[in-house]
């Protein structure tokens, strides 16, 4: 709450939601959190905050940010990004660029099982395409972010799918069968919207001849990600490939490329700071019983199946907004969701689907979520500028609401 008050308050004060640094709002709210944590000396309070920031999942994400920054900057400087953009522009007419990017993000995230890996692979390409045709960079980046959550929500190897199905005691296949009733209609509607928006794009960009050698780093990253290789290993291989391409085909020396990698790592500094501060705040919130308090208060007064499903959806969404991690949110709420599900006779497969889907929707609309932060950092834009263009999560949230109101799919009620 303090963070939201700080961020919204400062934004209103300066009259611009796009210029207020997230890091400042997190620093102020973190100081408040440490100061108001009771019954502990200051040193112990700082240790609680630091343990939250040093969570293994968070540090793993930091390593991804570092390697992603190095790869993105190196690929850009050696010409790999420009070559990939030229290939895309030569293959797809202007009206098909948005739908093509969205489908690519959906497919890659479905194969990889992670939205972050998809964002890392496609955001520089989306940014380059927008720049070439004079399109909105936040809009094109949002297409990638939205599509990345399609697969994250459906994939059998996604950590959110695994967490949701295990917590509810159902199979991943059954949860998938429920999810497609929500995700596929939403994706088709948004795909149609992108065709309409793309059809209005009028551009006569003269694409240069495609330099296939320069495309290899991005092609390698996408193929290895689809194969299912660990994202850190994929990025390392991508960096090596970009380095080799730079030495062999680009007019670049090794020392310059090391400098480019350093620039890329430096560009991720703000993202890493925000991630650590947000995780430290979560540590304080959990220590002070904030998550338990939210769950206890929100789970009271449930009436009927629709009320139970609505409460499960809201619970996981609110906890996700506090933790900025959809997997942790599902794990935190999963046990209580199963109790509610059994008490009100809900189908465990539908409950697992609601947990996964609503956590993904909530993750899209917080400016400090890993996916939006990563995309904004790679594109050099504000996180807030991306949020209004996230059409797919809006549509997915609407499908969840309709599925609760009209109780579909009937087989899973």
Put a short name on every predicted segment.
Residues 64, 95-108, 134-151, 307-320, ...:
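Alpha-helical transmembrane segments of multi-pass membrane proteins
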Residues 62-71, 93-125, 298-338, 355:
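Hydrophobic alpha-helical transmembrane segments of multi-pass integral membrane proteins
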Residues 13, 17, 146-149, 153-208, ...:
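Juxtamembrane and boundary regions of transmembrane helices in multi-pass small-molecule transporters
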Residues 12-25, 52-56, 88-93, 177, ...:
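Interfacial loop-to-helix junctions that mark the boundaries of transmembrane helices
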Residues 117-128, 145, 156-170, 293-294, ...:
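Re-entrant/interfacial helical elements at transmembrane boundaries that shape
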Residues 23, 27, 35, 46-79, ...:
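Core transmembrane alpha-helical segments of multi-pass membrane transporters/permeases
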Residues 1-7, 18-38, 61-67, 122, ...:
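Hydrophobic mid-bilayer segments of alpha-helices in multi-pass membrane transport proteins
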Residues 55-61, 86-104, 130-140, 208-216, ...:
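Membrane-interfacial loop-to-helix junctions in multi-pass transporters
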